[in-house]
Amino acid sequence: MNNTLFNSNYDKLIEPLYGIKRNIEEDKLLLQDNIVPSTYNICDRVDMTKQSIYSIDPDGCEDADDAFSIYEENDKLWLAIHIADPTEHINIGSSLWKNIEQNVVTRYPSNKKPIHMMPNEIMEKASLMVNQYGDIKLAITILTEIDKETYQPIGKVKLLFTKIKVSKNNALSYMNAGKSIESNTIISNGLKISKSLQNLRSLKTKGVVLNEISISFPKYDNLNNTSHLYLDSVTEISMKQMIAEFAIFANSFIGEYLKINFDGTGLYRICSAKDWLNTVYSEISGQDLLNEIIVNGIKAEYISTVSPHDLVGAPEYTHFTSPIRRLSDCVCHYLLKYIHLKSTIHDLCVPFTNDQLMKYSNDCVRLTKSIKNIQYKDTKFRIIQTINNMLINNENVTIQYYVTSYTGLYLNIIICNINEHCVYLSYTLRISDLQTKYEIKLVKSLDITRVNCIDKFDEGTIPELDNVFITKSV
């Protein structure tokens, strides 16, 4: 089966699941009653335009939510984590905000343009990248002193409303950032800081071993209409882990900040897994922990009252670092602005009621789960397409898989490796065979010589895998 047919089926079966694309004319109407500045705007900002700002993102990224700077001042070393501030361009009483409430998240169909949560104009104004709106951008910044010996945060962490200057030269891909570790002091110091942050988290949770996992993913060659499995280099992985640790540090600080300054209400990201984690053996690998998380149904959720996120090791945790693509983070930003402004504007209204916060948490849980399921289907489709490309190129293909559960009707399988590549691919077969006892979590290998394009069900997509189980039930 050729790629043209796969791509045609993707356009028919997968892309529509993400929903309707943004309409330029409708976005113009949304912007008409978006009057800014509005109630929660911050006019008095700390000027950090003299600092070198770095952003590290995937190739082709337009919606850069986060950046950082590391610098010395008064013989002290500082880490500043800068988060884009789209809410400064959004009136909370506008039709635009209602549209964002409905969208909840940005959707990312593979090898396609994103379906942004907000109109392009707002996205580009907020994005911490040089674009048609210039190189001076607004940010909410987490500032901490760093110990020059241990590279751990010390002293009081500060929350600042800032303006920063971004640079095209410092907008790096993970690959280019990784290549500059040895030559760029800021990048190398950032890596040292992130490793110290990870070591501190390892004292609180076994979840840090998830950082070990490197999942291969399809990489597209649109010029030649093909794809292949790609594994990040060691330096690319280290850059992704660095940015992740900065985000966890910022989200944990903001979670604590909201608990203290907003009476424990807000929009928190939680995962109640402490008791379960205590049952996991101490030397477990990242891949084995991920398998156990899947089998045991461990999941993170949004709630409107404070509670721990045990997988990241934080007693309070929120989503603050991706406001261009997540409603939850925008809500968090408005709450931070309210806390900042209420000391000088005594009659300032709280932006959201408790009922609204509860609704937001429910909407975020529902939409996040829905989009994650769509992304699983998307990834599955593209990996099957990539296996097809490998077979067309006469490559040998061996998969490793294991059974996660059997419900009495559906057999749930995870494909965890394709040749040397670690992947995560769910595969479900309908089998009415209560007599067979399936070995759960036992990894087995299977050579594959053909695949078919995914249709409504998984069965028939990998015939040789089907035959391992379906022939037994005949």
Explain the meaning of each model-derived region.
Residues 449-451, 474:
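Compositionally biased low-complexity segments enriched in polar/charged residues
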Residues 2-4, 10, 31-436, 444-447, ...:
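Electropositive polyanion-binding surfaces
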